[in-house]
Amino acid sequence: MSGRSTVAIIGGTGAEGGGIALRLAKAGHCVLIGSRDAAKAKAAASALAALAGVTIEGDGNRAVAAAGEIAILTVPYAAQRPTIEEIRDILAGKILVDATAPLVPPRVNRVQLPEGGSAVAAIQALLGEAVKVVSAFQNVSAEKLRHLDQPVDCDVLVCADDAPARQAVIDLIATIGMRGIDGGPICNSAAAEALTSLLIWVNRKYKVPGAGIRITGIDD
């Protein structure tokens, strides 16, 4: 997936989704912003496009999910399952990148994994083999993504049961100047999800805007 792709950002009106959208659009991909409210999605897409000098379009979640070759889910944990239920019939045959971290307010800097261990693995179980669910972007700062004049100095852990889907997402990540790290099967997503709360703690403790992770010992 190193060429130009059509990418639907489901729940793309938030900070994380907007940051990913900006990076992908600047890299030359066709980016679609989705929301439950199509008007809100169009307004967000217009604002992002003006900010970056690129073309980004917006529409309802179902419309952009249908148009996208790959979908990236960037909604809060509480909205993860309802959003997937809204579009699950459209996702068959596609790759779904799920950036969900199971943050439970108000104590978002404490690890609170769901009973099954991984929020993203639960979505793979829900959707079945027809959809290739890939966990990625949980540990990437939205603030860093949105500063297009600066590189995002961290790695992206990528987990999925389907190895070709994992590699496709790693290749997509490379197009925005970041390094995807093959993190193995979807159950390993629990580690990436837990790291999000730890990084929030680090941000607050050390007063940094967006701590990330870097895997050492691997050649670029």
Question: What is the predicted role of each segment?
Answer:
Residues A52-V54, D59-I95, P102-R107:
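Rossmann-like NAD(P)-binding element
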Residues G58, K132-Q138, I181-G183:
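General beta-strand structural signal in soluble alpha/beta enzymes
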Residues T100-E143, H147-L148:
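Rossmann-fold NAD(P)-binding glycine/threonine-rich loop
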Residues M1-A47:
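NAD(P)+-binding Rossmann beta1-loop-alpha1 motif at the extreme N-terminus of oxidoreductases
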Residues C154-D220:
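Active-site-lining helix/loop region of Rossmann-like oxidoreductase modules
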Residues G3-T6, G93, D153:
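Phosphate-coordination loops involved in phosphoryl transfer and adenosine-cofactor binding
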Residues I9-I10, L73, V158:
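Hydrophobic Val/Ile/Leu positions in short beta-strands of Rossmann-like dinucleotide-binding domains
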